């Protein structure tokens, strides 16, 4: 079935239908264009989302990147980013294959449709013109027939009239004959025009217009076929990216399955294991025994100058709780009259170690002086922490790992330089054997530079090996101390009832007479409590300073210095007016901050 046969009289219907088909094509192109914009906006938002949640720091500088949870999350973000790329690819394919192609095809269809309908309208106009000519010839024939009949009647009337002259009769007959001849010619013209119109009309309805309608049908069917193919491109663009999107989803699933809680726990241990030994048992302090508060009493273990005796390194104890914050030294205690203790300097800041009474000294120390281990500074993240080359600012375990990393890096660099030196030597030998390939002397600067780098890296490797050995020994020592303390059972407290103080005193006297006094028995519990305040691991200086004025350093915890003396800065002023320094010949202590000119590293 075709339009030329079945719809020969539906010219306007076909015109509306073909216009609707082209409008539908344009609507689909517009839909795909907006769909492309949606895909592009979706991909852009996905990329922005991924960029927002990706780690800002490089993986090598981000400790969190070592955890499988973080790695899986980053992998999921990367898969989402790849997914966004596939959405962009869908948008690009739709834009090129559908929007551009169908827009161009729609313009071609509009031109073809316009041409066909112009041809049909010309045929209609020609047929209408033929019909008008037929009508004109018909009216002329009708008019001529009436005129001929009228002339014949007039001639017949004059012929019968006896009063009419012979000349009038002849004239009337001639006029009737002329009119009859004109009517005959009009008849022949009308018949010819009618025959011509019928032929044109048959050609119009049976040949010309059916051909035009068939062309319109073919055009519309081609348009519909192309539109259906455009519908298919919409799904094909999606199907093309389905395998990649499936891989993205599979990658997300793999990332989800890659989360390893046990490994993350192990990584946390590797990152933050300090290597410190666990705290030992808290010693029992017996306050039931009478104590003499005189400064000269030797039972307190206080020297005659009023300074408490510091315990040696072999008797140091582990810190009780390494995670507590260190407080700044408190102001000096008040005198019995309520005022501050006089300073050793007339115009200087108050001394951090004032007073001569041992118990007052110990009370002041326990309130003002806190442990200053370098490793504990790193745990609390103090602003005064100084990053040293040997990583001594880190806990022992972390120091060992960082030193191991540095040693491996230096070893790789050393091997690279050695390989480069060997390659340069081989190239030099080739140049010497075949001078046309190059000048051997041109390689001397590179060889010399490589040798210099090798020597430098060897020294660095030796340096890091020594530091690593020291750090490993410290870690092993801490582990051994911790295990030995853990294995040793705690000492039972030697407490006595309040009403048996005399018996306890006599028993102590008896035991002391039977056993020789030892170094450990001479240390009373009150000194055991404060020995950790005096024991510090050696730390690296954070700067240097020069003494502007002379300072005697007669108070407890201070150190003397001469005007112009160079000192190492060990700890900055915490706001109390005192700074801890170290002398070149040894010895550390506090001096007034206003007496120094400080330069930080």
From Swiss-Prot:
Residues 393-470 form the REM-1 domain. InterPro entries: AH/BAR_dom_sf, F_BAR, FCH_dom, HR1_rho-bd, SH3-like_dom_sf, SH3_domain. Residues 471-601 are annotated as: Required for interaction with FASLG and localization to lysosomes. Residues 1-117 are annotated as: Required for translocation to the plasma membrane in response to insulin. Residues 293-537 are annotated as: Interaction with CDC42. The keyword Membrane applies. Changing residue 468 to S: Impairs interaction with CDC42. The keyword RNA-binding does not apply. Residues 544-601 are annotated as: Interaction with WAS. Residues 67-259, 388-481 form a coiled coil. The record marks 166 as: Mediates end-to-end attachment of dimers. The F-BAR domain binds the phospholipid membrane with its concave surface. The end-to-end polymerization of dimers of these domains provides a curved surface that fits best membranes with around 600 A diameter, and may drive tubulation. Interacts specifically with GTP-bound RHOQ. Interacts with DNM2 and PDE6G. Homodimerizes, the dimers can polymerize end-to-end to form filamentous structures. Interacts specifically with GTP-bound CDC42. Interacts with AKAP9, ARHGAP17, DAAM1, DIAPH1, DIAPH2, DNM1, FASLG/FASL, GAPVD1, LYN, microtubules, SRC, WAS/WASP and WASL/N-WASP. Interacts with the ligand binding domain of the thyroid receptor (TR) in the presence of thyroid hormone. May interact with CTNNB1 and HD/HTT. This is Cdc42-interacting protein 4. It comes from Homo sapiens. The lineage of its organism: Eukaryota, Metazoa, Chordata, Craniata, Vertebrata. The gene is TRIP10.
